[in-house]
């Protein structure tokens, strides 16, 4: 692995493994199969070790079933590992869960911690009581977050009346009221428009830099990672496949982009680069990083009068699929 964090360790995992037993119906056996079940052992995580320094903002990526949720549940103390260890600021999450959860914040794109039919200000007051936050500290922090997240005009609105972007900002406020040392974010920008994404990323960047909040971000959005994460960890089949900079990951595995071109009128397909594919009114051309970009552009321009052109990068899933192929997983 390339990187294990340069700051003093805040999160430490060593050989973290989680095995589960799955019960299955036998294919044969007559009436006995009604009460007899075959069992099969599977591994959600296998020998995962890493260090994360206090104040780091780390991206955790991988396809569905890679082990991301299991890892987060172990670090929050929801699950206990089969073997291996994990400490967060010296605490073992599942053994000291009551103390541990007071230092955590979490925002999950598809789940809510605020109350649906209650004005968000009332939800924040309830969270103050749950976390036993001192009144003065609570008011100072709420004022800070209200200004930073632009919540002033919606404080008396129930969550159900808010747009997706407003709900996400409110959820972030709720998760940060008690000033957690560690924040888990799961797809925080999913479904948001471009402006909302930019504002949310900027808030997280400032929160991380000014308060040294350690943030673990799971996302499929490459722009989230580019904007926020200097370090990424890639999970696959329960294993830690990569731990290093996003720049090096892209340099190694992001070997091709797609050029999309639309023309005013019909294009002369015979002049387009070999392998160009027509998709409706758009032509799609694969750009290899080691290819002759200048020649490709000459061919594209010679094929007709261009109306619009854009370059699409590989998304996270495509990047990981390439990694899997190279590792023969």
Where does each model-flagged region fall?
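Catalytic Walker B motif of ABC-type/P-loop ATPase nucleotide-binding domains
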Residues: 183-187
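Short, charged/small-residue-rich alpha-helical element at the C-terminal edge
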Residues: 257-329
